[in-house]
A protein has these predicted regions:
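Short beta->alpha junction loops
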Residues: 163-166
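Conserved "HGTGT" condensation-loop signature of ketosynthase/thiolase-family condensing enzymes
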Residues: 1-160
Length: 166
């Protein structure tokens, strides 16, 4: 096996955010600067959740322009992630695509999550417990790496793909 010791650089040239404070990075940052809270009292005791102060994301980003083949099979956490990734890519490349500058084999996607897929796992388990059957697509909804897969498909990135789970 031949080793490639050539240094490669990764440059982050854009960022995106969808948070309880705002539907994009600018709105979230402005809310922080205005000392706004991103959490509030939410009673979920009927679901066995003892925490009462939660930060919930009220609205989802528009995924207009995302092909239906990608969009319709994404769980909520992946739709939120794709929305933030679109903001980051827009900041980095404007109206262009990464493929206008780089080979698709040299472009990849690395995403990170700490919770992604767990809510969907709980929903699927509950659905199965109540009905004895659940959607065959739940295997896709519960995968944390569905976000990096969606980004790779959307931008036609054919390089390295990974999802870091904390």
């Amino acid at each position: 096996m031949q080793r490639n010791n050539e240094m490669r650089r990764v440059v982050v040239t854009g960022y995106g955010a969808i948070t309880p404070l705002g539907s994009n990075a600018q709105a979230s940052w402005q809310a922080i600067m205005d000392y706004q809270l991103g959490y509030g009292y939410v009673d979920k005791t009927e679901l066995g959740i003892k925490a009462h102060f939660l930060g919930l994301i009220a609205e989802e980003p528009s995924l207009k322009g995302v092909p239906a083949a990608i969009r319709r099979r994404l769980p909520r956490f992946a739709r939120l992630t794709l929305g933030a990734a679109r903001e980051a890519m827009s900041m980095a490349f404007g109206e262009s695509s990464p493929l206008d500058f780089y080979s698709p084999l040299m472009c990849g996607a690395i995403m990170g999550t700490g919770w992604g897929g767990l809510d969907e796992s709980y929903y699927a388990a509950r659905e199965f417990a109540l009905q004895g059957v659940s959607s065959p697509f739940n295997c896709f909804y519960t995968m944390p790496n569905v976000t990096s897969a969606a980004c790779s498909q959307y931008w036609n990135l054919r390089g390295y793909q990974n999802t870091v789970v904390a």
